[in-house]
Amino acid sequence: MSGARPLTVVVVDDSLTTRALIAAALRRDPRVKIVGTAGTPFEARDLIVRLNPDVLTLDFEMPSMNGLQFLEKIMRLRPMPVVMVSGHLSSHRGLVEQSLRMGAAEWYSKTTTANGEDPFAGLGDAIVRAAAMKQQAPVPVATDSANRTVPKIGTVVGIGASTGGVEALTDVLGHFPVACPPTVIVQHMPRQFSESFARRLDRIVKPEVRLAEEGDMLKPGTVYVASGGERHLRVRCGARSGEYVCQLVAAPPVNGHRPSVDELFYSLATTVGKNAVGVILTGMECDGAQGLLAMRHAGASTIGQDRASSVIYGMPRAAYELGAVETQLPLSAIGPAILNLCERRSLETYP
């Protein structure tokens, strides 16, 4: 690896002594660099999101959540090379095979040798091998989560905007990857401009952007834009457990608007709850403020655009003064913040 960047590693082990021993061993290996250590899966979750390491070493035996449980979450939500570490490898043969099917790249035994050699002397080699392996989708493993009714798609993003929103939405969605969280948008505009707006966004951003239609099932990688003028856009539960769909409702205008941001946000608060992220962007008056407050009360994360970057600081201001905005950010920071919140919420929740 001469001249190559060292592999960044996060070490997860409930034993402070073991973490120190691993750190000491890896400091002697120029091929790797420890960027963080964690004593629990919950600490590890935050480090993974923040540091994006090349490889994770994961202790199999930990309190609160064992290594296999955490491995399942990592491989489903943020696939990466993982080296499972155990002090009793010979007694875990079945679990070794299971973890490899789930996506682990390596198992490493930390048993102390008879001649007193460093039990982690070979861990650097295991990390390098793990990093060299092509990450593949894990084979599904049956768990109790199959019976749960938490939505399979994870977090849903709802965004409301008015004056200045066309440019603001272009900026926010420009940060989204192809496989973005399912996103529903209400942008105040006449009906005749909605379709061309959605087509324009679809051409310039990575996810698919389309006008929302009755019964559209929300899925990752797709952004659903409400058509202006005739009907409100709401999100409701689908016919099958764990699904959300678009609902178009012919009802009177709310706050002088149809579709209304409040209508969308209220539906997300009721249907999606804490698995939602609500965002209110530039626009005049107050549409969306009460709905965003309902989302926050339901446990959702909420973001408001700040005054300096807003064309009209009306809707964001109304929401902020109402206490509906958890975090106020400049426009350029909102897209990355949405993705970060979605990653954190996904790592906190079994689907």
From Swiss-Prot:
Biological process, per Gene Ontology: chemotaxis
Gene: cheB
Superkingdom as given in the UniProt entry: Bacteria
Subcellular location(s) of the protein: Cytoplasm
PTM characteristics: Phosphorylated by CheA. Phosphorylation of the N-terminal regulatory domain activates the methylesterase activity.
Protein's name according to its UniProt entry: Protein-glutamate methylesterase/protein-glutamine glutaminase
Domain CheB-type methylesterase: 151-345
Entry remark concerning the domains of this protein: Contains a C-terminal catalytic domain, and an N-terminal region which modulates catalytic activity.
Enzyme class label: hydrolase
Catalytic activity of the protein: [protein]-L-glutamate 5-O-methyl ester + H2O = L-glutamyl-[protein] + methanol + H(+); L-glutaminyl-[protein] + H2O = L-glutamyl-[protein] + NH4(+)
Family: Belongs to the CheB family.
Residue span(s) of domain Response regulatory: 8-125
One matching Pfam family: Response_reg
Job of this protein: Involved in chemotaxis. Part of a chemotaxis signal transduction system that modulates chemotaxis in response to various stimuli. Catalyzes the demethylation of specific methylglutamate residues introduced into the chemoreceptors (methyl-accepting chemotaxis proteins or MCP) by CheR. Also mediates the irreversible deamidation of specific glutamine residues to glutamic acid.
EC number: 3.1.1.61, 3.5.1.44
Chief site of localization: cytoplasm
Keywords, alphabetical: Chemotaxis, Cytoplasm, Hydrolase, Phosphoprotein
